[in-house]
Every structure is written in structure tokens, then in C-alpha cells.
A protein has these predicted regions:
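Short amphipathic alpha-helical interaction segments
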Residues: 38-54
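Short acidic, hydrophobic short linear motifs in intrinsically disordered regions
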Residues: 20-34
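A short, conserved structural fragment
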Residues: 53-63
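Short alpha-helical segments that sit at the start of domains
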Residues: 1-22
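Short, amphipathic alpha-helical interaction segments positioned at domain boundaries
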Residues: 73-89
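Short amphipathic alpha-helical segments that mediate assembly, nucleic-acid/protein binding
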Residues: 3-7, 27-31, 42-45, 78-79
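Minor-groove-contacting beta-hairpin "wing" of winged helix-turn-helix DNA-binding domains
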Residues: 65-73
Length: 89
């Protein structure tokens, strides 16, 4: 599965009904529910997640249970996050 498609799945989840306000934690089980290909292709999206972390949007945890958590105060608009993510080289 393409990196851009995987990222859009995650971004759409983040901003769906402001779900990030209910729980800023994204665990591996949730990623599996969103799309089974995310965990298998995690290496494809990890560089962008590292960029998100560098920008202060998320904190990568990457333990056995939790993939990452959002930093709500720093999270940009959905449109900005999509633009930054899809333009990442």
C-alpha cells in the first residue's frame, strides 16, 4: 500500500469528529483496526511520523502497546498536516 494512502488513513482518523480530543493515544491495535497494512508498512510512514515529532505534533512511543500520542496544543489543521505529509520527500 502506498505511503500517502496510509498517512491519509491516519490523518482522517485524527480529525474525524475531533477524535483526538477524546484520547491523544494511538495504539497498535487501533492502527490495525484502521488498516491492517499500517503495521506491516510502518517503515514507509515512520520518516513522516519522525517529522511530525520534530514539529511537535506527536510523541513517538513505539513500545509493544502504543505507537504514538498527539500533542493537542501543537496539532495543525487537517489541511496543513496533509499538505506537509504528502509533500515530504
Amino acid at each position: 500500500m502506498k505511503r500517502s494512502r496510509l498517512l491519509l488513513i491516519i490523518i482522517n482518523y485524527i480529525y474525524h469528529d475531533n477524535i483526538y480530543l477524546m484520547s491523544p493515544i494511538v495504539d497498535w491495535n487501533l492502527l490495525d483496526v484502521l488498516n491492517k497494512n499500517i503495521r506491516n508498512n510502518y517503515k514507509k510512514i515512520r520518516p513522516i511520523l519522525l517529522k511530525w515529532q520534530e514539529n511537535g505534533y506527536i510523541k513517538l512511543i513505539e513500545d509493544n502497546e502504543i505507537a504514538f500520542s498527539f500533542i493537542l496544543e501543537k496539532l495543525p489543521s487537517k489541511e496543513k498536516l496533509i499538505e506537509e505529509s504528502l509533500n515530504f520527500k
